[in-house]
Amino acid sequence: MSSLNVKIQDVFDEPACERNRSKDSNARSKGCSKPLTPGAAAGGCAFDGAKIVLQPITDVAHLVHAPLACEGNSWDNRGTASSGPTLWRTSFTTDLTEQDIVMGNSERKLFKAIRQIREAYQPPAIFVYATCVTALIGDDIEAICKRAEETCGLPVVPINSPGFVGSKNLGNKLAGEALLDHVIGTVEPDDAGPCDINILGEFNLSGEFWLVKPLLERLGIRVRACIPGDARYLDIASAHRARAAMLVCSTALINLARKMEERWDIPFFEGSFYGITATSEALRQIADLLVKKGTDLEILDRTDALIAEEEAIAWKKLEEYRPRLKGKRVLINTGGVKSWSLVHALMEIGMEIVGTSVKKSTVEDKERIRQVLKDDLQMFESMSPRELYAMLSEHKADIMLSGGRTQFIALKAKMPWVDINQERHRPYAGYDGTVELVRQIDLAIHNPVWSQVREPAPWESRPATQEPLPNTRPDTDATSVGRSIRRHDAGDFVEC
């Protein structure tokens, strides 16, 4: 069995996942992916999943060993943000052609590309991604990366996650395995402290982690590594010296959190920064874990004081929206951590949840939703575009929160819509982010355009009148006039 197959089977056997533990050995070996529906979009592949997790590491050069389309279709697939380096925004690919593949030139081309990147950009590390084509022709990227690392004198990390091996979620986990095998623990920090933590599965979408990080800094807590949002290579390499960790998206990186706890005794919990209550609870749990690891008890008092102050400010800002949004019905079509954290956040201001998608949610996510909604009928695994349109057009919801792929369903139904997926341009995390989310929902629902587009069109509201058809018969008067013209005699046509 190849090393990739061994790694995949190891990822499929995840003791920290309740759904995985409930399976027998035969079902566990198949993973959590469901068969694709013929004719439907397949969604992201394993390569796409690995790229999503690792691309936000901002100072690393990400080199895709593939034909041009693999990098062209995956570049900038998440709206993450960087507070410093911009190298991650540059696209690198070996751009394999048919001739490279037929003539066996692909491995030589990869080594040359690594050397060129090192000479031109001097990155702290280079990540090399395997893809379907290069995996099928048998390119040994691990051997090439090892040789390039010895030659160039910098870390060259192989990301062995070709698209055909599985789903996007599997690619997420294989990316975490690559960090464990080649990056984390390779650098010893000289400034490790008692209040260092890791944030796992936080992608810093639209810079939203920047709304949370100042809160942690006010408590004296340092983020040793945020993986992957706005991360630096050296921060991740020294992440093994953190004292505690918070897991934001367990669907993607639960294997990374569990193995870091096993190897380096870094306890973790799963939490969310979406919503006022969820943010406060996350801060308290971080403080509790640090105290258990030996931090001064004073941090608990500081945390309670900070939470009381920030909650008072946030609730004061939300008061103007509460009467305008109370009782409004929301349909949430997303997944993962947002499927339960947004439910709680919106119910806090009096909105009613008519349904939330749990397609990408874990067993723990679903249990959290049940505790809040008390009704399994409000959770749906998947809903077809036709069903979404029917639900919105029949006014069973006042607004839909989803990603860009379903926005036109809401617009066709003439209903408000707010983007909450990775393509969005506004941050919604933390106390300030919650206020911003509520503000955007209020703007969408009360936008005057909806009352206008729902009115009948002018030609639909005008009373029908039957206009007379034009007369195509010859005019009687004109005929009589024609008949009154004098007749010509033979003399009229005599040549002059």
Swiss-Prot record:
GO terms for molecular function: nitrogenase activity. Gene3D superfamilies: Nitrogenase MoFe cofactor biosynthesis protein NifE, C-terminal, Nitrogenase molybdenum iron protein domain. GO terms for biological process: nitrogen fixation; protein-containing complex assembly. Pathway: Cofactor biosynthesis; Fe-Mo cofactor biosynthesis. The keyword Nucleotide-binding does not apply. InterPro entries: Nase/OxRdtase_comp1, Nase_comp1_CS, NifE, NifE-like. Pfam families: Oxidored_nitro. Keywords: Nitrogen fixation, Plasmid. Residues 455-491 are annotated as: Disordered. Belongs to the NifD/NifK/NifE/NifN family. PANTHER family: NITROGENASE IRON-MOLYBDENUM COFACTOR BIOSYNTHESIS PROTEIN NIFE. This protein may play a role in the biosynthesis of the prosthetic group of nitrogenase (FeMo cofactor). NCBIfam families: nifE (TIGR01283). This is Nitrogenase iron-molybdenum cofactor biosynthesis protein NifE. It comes from Sinorhizobium fredii (strain NBRC 101917 / NGR234). The lineage of its organism: Bacteria, Pseudomonadati, Pseudomonadota, Alphaproteobacteria, Hyphomicrobiales. The gene is nifE.
